[in-house]
């Protein structure tokens, strides 16, 4: 049996407090872990990394405990926490998170030159000390600032989301299938910057989110140059497939999302395919 480990997945129940995104993740969104498990079993996917919609980890901690060996958790940045290091320790103890998703490095109107003065540096430093993974999804200016942080914190592990596209949430829309969509060039003009970050051995990248950027119908052939670039710069050992469940559950479908590995990277060896669909994630997370 093949062993696949999925990347970003989201589970949510209305009874738990969480962040609401109108039209995309309304308050009544009901995505129990059991729905994800059913799809995983039908596609021979064994394990999943789950990321909630906001900094509330209640359900995440519950399903990690309820299904031992099945899930690993990545939390979301909690901007309301007065002490980021303490917040991390509390969430590690309560919910066993192994990373934090963030979307910026400095929120200042006038960004300082010293990366140690960036608004998110205390969090990033605390994450590096605790060997937590940075789940990163941000626009290009913030990626450039992250590059400076990595000069100071070279051991910090960063996982770029969704094929390394660098987009602003200000540009986020919802498509006809109730999925996130960004209007952007394909290939994006930020590949050179992404390639610079790929030179650092502690950077990784999701093979995911193609539907949100592509101008073509499934299997998104305009994403072929992006897939090729990622393969050539990061390599299979730093690539991890992600489904982006639940947004893809209906269109294109969970199995179809997994099949994009073969559609967009048709020349992989079996060992490379297994690395992208499981080995890399297993090297980064404990299940």
Language model regions located:
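Hydrophobic faces of well-ordered beta-strands that scaffold small-molecule active sites
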Residues: 1, 47-50, 72-75, 98-102, ...
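Divalent metal-dependent hydrolysis catalytic cores, especially in the metallo-beta-lactamase
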Residues: 17-55, 70-76, 98-105, 134
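His/Asp/Glu-enriched, well-ordered alpha-helical/loop segment
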Residues: 245-287
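Short, acidic/polar
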Residues: 29-39, 81-92, 190
């Amino acid at each position: 049996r093949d062993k696949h480990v999925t990347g970003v997945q989201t589970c949510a129940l209305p009874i738990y407090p969480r962040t609401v995104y109108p039209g995309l993740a309304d308050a009544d969104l009901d995505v129990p872990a059991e729905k994800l498990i059913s799809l995983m079993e039908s596609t021979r996917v064994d394990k999943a990394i789950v990321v909630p919609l906001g900094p509330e980890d209640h359900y995440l901690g519950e399903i990690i405990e309820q299904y031992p060996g099945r899930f690993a958790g990545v939390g979301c940045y909690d901007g309301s926490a007065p002490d980021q290091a303490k917040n991390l320790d509390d969430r590690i103890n309560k919910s066993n998170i192994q990373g934090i998703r963030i979307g910026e490095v400095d929120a200042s109107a006038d960004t300082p030159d010293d990366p140690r003065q960036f608004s998110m540096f205390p969090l990033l430093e605390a994450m590096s000390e605790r060997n937590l993974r940075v789940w990163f999804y941000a626009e290009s200016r913030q990626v450039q600032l992250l590059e400076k942080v990595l000069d100071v914190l070279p051991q910090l592990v960063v996982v770029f989301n969704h094929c390394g596209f660098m987009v602003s949430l200000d540009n986020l829309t919802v498509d006809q299938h109730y999925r996130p969509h960004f209007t952007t060039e394909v290939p994006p003009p930020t590949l050179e910057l992404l390639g610079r970050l790929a030179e650092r051995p502690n950077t990784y990248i999701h093979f995911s989110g193609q539907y949100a950027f592509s101008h073509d119908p499934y299997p998104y052939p305009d994403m072929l140059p992006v897939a090729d670039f990622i393969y050539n710069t990061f390599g299979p050992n730093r690539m991890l497939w992600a489904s982006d469940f639940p947004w893809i559950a209906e269109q294109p479908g969970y199995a179809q999302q997994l099949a994009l590995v073969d559609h967009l990277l048709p020349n992989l060896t079996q060992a490379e395919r297994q690395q992208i669909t499981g080995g890399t994630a297993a090297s980064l997370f404990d299940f």
